[in-house]
C-alpha cells in the first residue's frame, strides 16, 4: 500500500500535468485521513476551480483558511473565484491578504493587477504589473496583461509591443496571439495579420473563447469567404451549446436571430450578473439631468446623427453632460463641446471615479451611446451611475444586462412581438428611432461622375456600407442583378486592397467582369455626401442594414432597396424608408428584392419619380426635423423619470 506522502506527490504530479480529475480523486481520498491539512484543502479547492465548479472550490478554500488563516495560497485561490464571478472588490481583498502574508507572491500580485484593470483602476493596476516584472521579468503572462491594460488605456502601439514581447517569451501563449490579433483587427485594420494570429492561437488552444467568431469577422472585412459556410456552421452549433464563440456585434452582421442575439449577449456579460443592484433614490433636481456617455464624440456616424439633439435640448428643462470615453479628439469634438452644460473627458479615469463624479452631478438618466461597439466601456454602467440607465442609438440590439432600464427604439426596428428579446424595457419614439441632423453641409465643389471614376451612361447600383456587412448571399444576389442589367455597374466602398481583389475574384466566379464593380475611397463627410447623389439605386445589405449610410442616401435623394428581417439591425433601413413614405422599397425575401432592383434599373422614369419624392421636404420632415425629434426624445426622458 502506498503511503500518504507518495499518493500526495502522485496527485500533485498529475495536477501539474493537467490531469485535474485524476488528481482530485486522490486529494479526496487523502482528505479522509487528513481533514485538517490546509495545503491539501487548497489543492482540492483549486481542482474544482479549474473545472469551473466555483461553489465547491470556494467551500474547500474557506475550510483551508479557517484551519490556517496564514495560508496565502488559499486567499489567492478564493480571490480567483471571486474574480471569475465578477466580484472584483472581494477578489482584491483576498489578493491583498495573500500579499500581506507573502510579500513577493507573484500570482497574487498578478491577479490583483488584472482585477484592478477589470474595474478600470488603471494606475493601481500598472503598479502591480511593475511589481510582477521585478519578481519575474521573463514571464510571458505579465506582458500579455500589460498589453491588455495599454489597450484599455487606448495606447495601442504600446499594447502591440507588449503582446509581441509576450509571444517572444512564450511561443505557446495562445492568449497573447489572440489579444494581438484582436488589436490588429480592431485598431489597426491589419486583418491578414490578425487572422494569422487567430490561427496561431487556435492551434495552441482551439477552444479559446470567441476565437472562431473573431476570425470569421476579420475574414468578412477582407471578403475572404473560402470557408465561410463551414465556419458559420461551427459558430451556430457552438451558440446552441451555449459556448462563447462570437461577440454580440459580430453576430449581428452574420445571423438574423434576435433571440440568439439576446442569448449570446447575456453569455458575454455573465460575469457581471452577480453584481448586486442598488436602489438609487430619485433626485429632486429642478432640471432633468442627462449624462450622454460615448466613445464617438468625434468624426463618427453616431456623432453625425446626434449633433442636433445636443444642440436642440431645451436647456430650461434639461441639463446635459457629455462624458467622453473614447481616445479620439478632432474638430467635431470641439464643435459638440459647446452644446453641453459641461463636456468631460473621462477616458483615463476609473469606473469608481466616474461613479463618484456622476453622483456629484446628480444624474437622473445615463445614456449609453456606444453599447457593445469599438472603445466601449460598459463596466461604467455596472456601477449604476444614475437612477435610470438607457441604451440608445450606438448599438442596435440588447445590452443583455439588468443594469439597463430602457432601450429607445421605434415599432419597426423592435415590433411588439420582439420585446421579449431585449433585457431592457422597450420605450418607443413615435417615428424613426434614428436621430438626424436637419441640415448637413455638402461640398459646393462642382463635380460630375467622371470625377469619381464613374461611367457616364451606366445605371449605378451602389452600397457604401462597411465591408463586413456584405455576406456571400447578398453579394450573389447583387451579381444576379448585374447579370440581368447589362448596362449597369456596382459602386462600393473600398476599405482595403485585398478586400477589393477578393470581391473581384468572387464576382468572376459568378460570371461578372471586375470592371463592373467600382470602388470609392473614404472621403470627408462633405465630399462623401456630394458623390452619393450619383448612385441611382442603393442596394442594402442583410442581415446588417445600412444605418447612417441609409439616411445619408435619403438625404442625397437616392432611393434604397432593402430587405427586412427579424433582428433590430436588419430592420433599420425599413424604419427609415417608412418614415419617408417609401415602404414599397422594403422586401422580405431575396427573390422579390432582385426582381424589384432589375425592374427599377430598366425603368429609369420610376427611379426619377423616387428621386423626386425624396426632394420634397414634406416627405423628409419625419426623418430630418431634428427639433421635433428632440422634443419627442425629451418626452421619453420625462416619462422615464416620472
Question: Residue ranges of each PLM-predicted region?
Answer:
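Short alpha-helix at the nucleotide-sugar/activated-sugar donor binding site of glycosyltransferases
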Residues: 554-555, 578
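Alpha-helical solenoid repeat scaffolds of the TPR/TPR-like class and their adjacent stem/linker regions
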Residues: 1-454, 466, 476, 505-512, ...
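Short Ser/Thr-rich beta->loop micro-motif in glycosyltransferases that lines
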Residues: 370, 540-546, 564
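Substrate-binding clefts and catalytic carboxylate motifs of secreted carbohydrate-active enzymes
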Residues: 462-473
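Donor-sugar nucleotide-binding helix/loop cap in glycosyltransferases
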Residues: 539, 553
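A conserved nucleotide-sugar
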Residues: 317-319, 479-509, 514
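Short acidic/histidine- and often glycine-rich active-site loop of Leloir-type glycosyltransferases
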Residues: 570-581
